[in-house]
């Protein structure tokens, strides 16, 4: 299961040994670290973040040269609010290397990602679901090429099959 999770993450997000993955707490939840497994598979580095404030996140991305950050909706919203309210200025941070932000575990409002892209237009984005249900991240994910479909559940991930059934168990 763990090896498949690593292969799925690497397939979905193209991690290389040069990536630096920001692991955000709580580390007792598998999502905080299993999304890093694609980087682990390729020899990529992880940074363990202490705290989830917008300033802490941006400082870590800047100082540690993080390329991939996994967030939850509230953390992304808090970060955008801090930027909107001019509490933080992205010009104060070295963020050019940051290439991918992905979210999972809960519905993602399309307006959130649209707003995110206003500040970070070069970022790839993915939504991941199914970690708790399947012992591996990305059993269902949006896919980095499908940002126009944010809000949808996504597609079956690498090595997974999925089907939609009705109340009688019939494929629809």
Regions found by a protein language model. Give the residues of each.
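AMP-binding (ANL) adenylation modules
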Residues: 25-28, 133, 170-171
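Gly/Ser/Thr-rich phosphate-binding loop
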Residues: 41, 66-71, 80-148, 158-161
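Conserved beta-loop-beta connector loops within the AMP-binding
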Residues: 163-172
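Active-site phosphate/pyrophosphate- and oxyanion-stabilizing loops and adjacent acidic/basic residues
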Residues: 7, 77, 114-115, 151
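Conserved AMP-binding/adenylation subdomain of ANL enzymes
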Residues: 3-20, 28-68, 82-83
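Alpha-helix capping/helix-boundary segments
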Residues: 53, 74-76, 108
């Amino acid at each position: 299961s763990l090896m498949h999770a690593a292969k799925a993450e690497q397939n979905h997000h193209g991690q290389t040994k040069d990536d630096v993955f920001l692991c955000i707490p709580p580390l007792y939840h598998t999502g905080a670290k299993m999304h890093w497994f694609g980087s682990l598979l390729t020899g990529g580095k992880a940074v363990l973040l202490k705290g989830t404030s917008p300033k802490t996140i941006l400082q870590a991305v800047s100082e540690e040269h993080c390329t991939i950050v996994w967030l939850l909706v509230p953390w992304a919203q808090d970060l955008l609010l801090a930027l909107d309210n001019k509490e933080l200025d992205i010009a104060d941070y070295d963020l050019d290397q940051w290439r991918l932000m992905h979210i999972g575990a809960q519905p993602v409002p399309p307006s959130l990602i649209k707003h995110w892209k206003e500040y970070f237009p070069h970022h790839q984005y993915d939504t991941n679901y199914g970690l708790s249900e399947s012992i591996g991240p990305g059993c269902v994910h949006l896919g980095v090429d499908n940002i126009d479909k944010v809000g949808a559940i996504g597609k079956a991930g690498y090595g997974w099959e999925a089907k939609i059934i009705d109340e009688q168990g019939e494929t629809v």
